[in-house]
A protein has these predicted regions:
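N-terminal hydrophobic/helix-forming segments and targeting peptides
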Residues: 1-441
Length: 441
């Protein structure tokens, strides 16, 4: 990259860090993205209206997933260009009845969300985020632990002096899921002579300060996420360390590409999806029909059939891949690994074992991606998710391609993926943006 490109990359990543800090959950990501879209002139989509080239619309799916689109110069019948990333990340979700007291300390019970190494979530500062729906239907947004002066929370761990039994266990067994309980208080309510005085004190505080009663947990989506901010990493500031790179490091570039591409040849359809980390199910996941329904509305406006639009469309499934880590190089096949600072990584297939659970892009789709990226001088590489039979993973590509849409995975290589603090290179983030601009152009 030239000095000019590097400066552009570093400048671009300042906006990305701001986005990351504002969007630690899928709901916050949608709220932040909608504000960005409306500022850029996007309006809510109305399926009863007719749109023309250059019109910019968005569809908010339950506040947890989002579609943004810019109508292209060509008819929708000739296909659309789809970019999709997911905005959910591994975290600790609160159980429906989370609040309890033990040993005169108050805790919240959790059920971890997504694939985590449980031991990584102990003894780090956590913030509480989410939405509470009260009995009367009113809603309350919660974010405690992010602002200067806010309290933070944590999952405690066993001191090494008493951990002989624990340390004989495997890493997977050392911290049990049922022990990922969040410490939230220890001060008993004064003058209370009843049982569970600390829990009563915390319940009183929740009501007085936040208007939450214990029963409200039954109709809430609350989770614990790392309380730290996105930070430049390395003396050269070439990297970013943060929670939630997977997959907001792709969500932000495709959103910015959508906003910045003012007059695309083909209609651009940008999706920020939920539930990828748990299988893409539910109405806000890519295994639902909300993408198909949106394209069907576009097809109806153009007087064509949705299946014909899908067959003529292409999708870049923007999801991360595992960057080569020299400290753990034995799990990678180096000739087919992705590396930080080598640009956006195009992943033909994911899956496990014999490519189980993968989209496996066609040779024609790979050639299509090559032509687009090379034509715009985008820095790119190919990569697999580790050695054969080492493990595996999946993306939303398989759920898009089931609609007969040619799809390939493309995204940012990540170090320490799924950890509370993941690492990416700024150059790769910017090249992902440039790849999506080239695709939408």
């Amino acid at each position: 990259m030239s000095e000019e490109e590097l400066k552009a990359a570093y400048d671009f990543c300042e906006g990305y860090k701001t986005f990351l800090d504002a969007a630690k959950t899928e709901r916050e990501a949608v709220t932040t993205a909608v504000a960005m879209l409306e500022k850029a002139g996007y309006v809510p989509f109305d399926h009863a209206k007719q749109y023309k080239a250059g019109d910019k619309v968005y569809l908010n799916n339950r506040g947890k997933a989002l579609i943004a689109a810019t109508l292209g110069r060509r008819s929708v019948a000739e296909g659309v260009r789809i970019g999709v990333a997911h905005i959910d990340s591994p975290r600790l979700d609160l159980k429906p009845r989370p609040l309890y007291e033990e040993g005169e300390q108050c805790f919240l019970k959790t059920h971890y969300y997504g694939g985590i190494k449980k031991y990584q979530w102990t003894a780090i500062p956590l913030a509480l985020h989410g939405t509470v729906i009260r009995k009367d239907g009113s809603s309350l947004s919660v974010a405690i632990g992010e602002e200067e002066g806010d309290p933070v929370f944590c999952v405690t761990d066993l001191l090494p002096h008493l951990a002989a039994d624990q340390m004989r266990k495997t890493l997977a067994e050392g911290i049990e899921g049922e022990k990922l309980n969040i410490l939230i208080g220890s001060a008993a309510l004064r003058d209370d002579t009843g049982a569970e005085k600390v829990k009563v004190a915390i319940a009183k505080l929740l009501f007085e300060k936040y208007g939450i009663v214990e029963e409200d947990f039954l109709s809430a989506e609350l989770c614990a996420v790392p309380a730290f901010k996105a930070r430049d990493l390395g003396l050269d500031r070439s990297m970013i360390g943060a929670y939630g790179h997977d997959d907001r490091v792709c969500a932000y570039p495709i959103l910015m590409a959508e906003i910045d591409e003012k007059s695309p040849e083909y209609t651009s359809v940008t999706i920020l999806a939920d539930k990828e980390e748990t299988g893409s199910n539910g109405p806000t996941g890519m295994n639902s029909y909300f993408l198909k329904d949106f394209i069907e509305d576009l097809a109806d406006m153009a007087g064509c059939k949705v299946r014909h639009v899908a067959a003529n469309s292409h999708c870049f499934s923007a999801d991360v891949n595992a960057a080569f880590d020299p400290i753990y190089g034995e799990v990678h096949e180096r000739r087919n690994a992705s590396y930080i600072n080598y640009g956006v990584v195009v992943t033909k297939y994911t899956g496990a074992r014999g490519k189980a659970g993968t989209n496996d892009a066609t040779a024609e789709m790979m050639g299509f991606a090559r032509r687009i990226l090379d034509a715009e001088h985008v820095g790119w590489q190919t990569g697999e998710l580790g050695k054969v039979d080492q493990g595996g993973g999946g993306t939303v590509a398989m759920y898009v391609s089931q609609h007969n849409i040619d799809t390939v995975d493309l995204g940012v290589p990540v170090l320490s993926m799924h950890a509370p603090f993941e690492v990416v290179a700024k150059a790769d983030v910017y090249m992902t943006y440039r790849a999506m601009r080239a695709f939408y152009k």
